A protein has these predicted regions:
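Active-site and ligand/interface coordination hotspots across diverse enzymes
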Residues: 1-95, 144-154, 205-208, 242
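C-terminal capping/extension of enzyme domains
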Residues: 1-13, 18, 137-149, 172-244
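Glycine-centered helix-coil hinge/cap
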Residues: 38-39, 112, 167
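Short, well-ordered beta-to-alpha junction loops that form the rim of enzyme active sites
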Residues: 44, 54-55, 123-124, 165-170
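Mobile, glycine- and charge-enriched loop segments
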Residues: 48-51, 59-144, 222-244
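Structural motif
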Residues: 51, 164, 218-220
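A structural motif corresponding to the C-terminal end of an alpha-helix
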Residues: 105-117, 157-160, 209-217
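Proline-aspartate-enriched helix->loop->beta-strand connector
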Residues: 151-169
Length: 244
C-alpha cells in the first residue's frame, strides 16, 4: 500500500528529475538514479541514517520520468524497496561491494536483524554514465544545481539524524565531492567541522569529519573502495553513538 507521505515525496521529486533530464538533454549515455530506502525507514525509528555515495557505477533506468515515478510499474525507480538490491540471489551488493560492506557493518550496529530495512541509499550525483564510472566534470557542473536541490529535498523530507557522505577525498574536483552540497545546505557557506576522527593508523590523513547543519549531523569520509573496511565502519559507528 502506498501511503500519502510517499505520494507527497513523489510530487516533490518528479519535477526536479524533469529538470535533471533537461540538464542532461536526455542523453542516453547518462541515466538517472533515484534514492532507495528500506520498508522501515519511513517509520519513526530510533536511529535514522541516510547513506550517500558519489554516483551510481553503472545503472539501468530511463529518462522517461513518468515511468520512473509510476507506482504501478514494477520496473520503476521511485519507491523501489532497497531489499531487492542487497538480498538478491547472488548477494553481489554486499559480498563484492566495499561500499555496501561498510554500510552493512554500520547498520547492523543499530539494527542487527534485517538491517537493510532501516536505511536509505542515494548519491550526490543523480545522473551518471550508464556503462559505469563517475560523471565527467562537465556533467557534474551542468547538473550540480539540480543535484543540490534533490539532495536538499531528500534530507528535508526524511529528516534523518545522520547523513553519511562517502564523498570525501576523491582524486578529482579538488579532492572532495561534499563541499558543494554542504555549502548549499548551509546557505552558501562551508560549515566548520565540529568533530574529526582518524580511522586508519597507517594513513593518519584518513579522517572523517562531522558537520552539523540545522540539527542534522553530516559525517563526511572517504569512499570505502580500496580502504580498510572494519576500522572505517567502527569509527563511523562510534561517531554516530557520540552524537546520538
Amino acid at each position: 500500500m502506498i501511503n500519502n507521505r510517499i505520494l507527497e515525496f513523489r510530487e516533490i521529486l518528479q519535477p526536479l528529475y524533469e529538470t535533471l533530464k533537461n540538464d542532461c538533454n536526455s542523453d542516453g549515455k547518462l541515466l538517472p538514479f533515484v534514492m532507495h530506502w528500506g520498508e522501515c525507514f519511513a517509520e519513526d525509528i530510533p536511529v535514522k541514517i541516510m547513506f550517500y555515495g558519489r554516483a551510481v557505477n553503472g545503472w539501468d533506468s530511463t529518462w522517461n520520468i513518468d515511468k520512473c515515478f509510476d507506482l504501478s510499474d514494477p520496473d520503476r525507480e521511485f519507491n523501489k524497496d532497497i531489499s531487492g538490491l542487497v538480498t538478491c540471489s547472488d548477494g553481489w551488493f554486499v559480498k563484492h561491494s566495499q561500499f555496501w560492506a561498510v554500510i552493512k557493518q554500520i547498520s547492523q550496529a543499530f539494527y542487527p536483524d534485517d538491517w537493510f530495512k532501516y536505511i536509505s541509499w542515494s548519491n550526490v550525483c543523480k545522473a551518471a554514465p550508464s556503462k559505469g564510472r563517475n560523471p565527467s566534470d562537465r556533467v557534474y557542473n551542468k547538473t550540480l544545481r539540480t543535484n543540490q536541490k534533490i539532495l536538499e529535498a531528500e534530507i528535508k523530507f526524511w529528516s534523518p539524524q545522520f547523513v553519511v557522505l562517502f564523498t570525501g577525498g576523491d582524486w578529482s574536483r579538488g579532492g572532495d565531492w561534499s563541499k558543494d552540497f554542504l555549502c548549499h545546505m548551509n546557505d552558501g557557506r562551508m560549515p566548520k567541522a565540529k568533530f574529526e576522527a582518524m580511522w586508519d593508523d597507517e594513513y593518519p590523513d584518513r579522517k572523517l569529519k562531522v558537520y552539523e547543519i540545522n540539527g542534522v549531523y553530516y559525517i563526511v569520509t572517504l569512499h570505502p573502495m580500496g580502504k580498510k573496511l572494519k576500522p572505517h565502519g567502527k569509527c563511523i559507528i562510534e561517531t554516530i553513538n557520540k552524537f546520538l
